[in-house]
């Protein structure tokens, strides 16, 4: 079952009762940035990630890395601090460098791929490796892709 981690706590609890592992996207620790790019703030998302960790439930964190949006030292450090503070760490953190593979799919469906026209770029290999290093410095397991 697919659900959004910004659903109600009851929904999150129900999903945990019926699944073995959660894959959770964490796009930005800055609620304003999250609101700008995702149209919703991140407080409920962070609260539900904490809820999953406190339930001692296995989960992966997926962080899409977008140059100029969230692939920077400040956001990754804040993400690492938050995740390292939880009673159960994610099994792994998958850093997902931005790509535009979905552009063709959106065109076929008649939808707009980037409706707000943001400049979306893949971070350099160097930036990706710096992000991995920050996360591992906090005792977290991280990889590119996943």
Q: Which sequence ranges carry the predicted segments?
A:
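Hydrophobic faces of well-ordered beta-strands that scaffold small-molecule active sites
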Residues: 22-24, 59-61, 91-97
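Generic structural signal for hydrophobic
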Residues: 14-15, 52, 83, 135
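Auxiliary Fe-S-binding modules of radical SAM enzymes
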Residues: 67-146
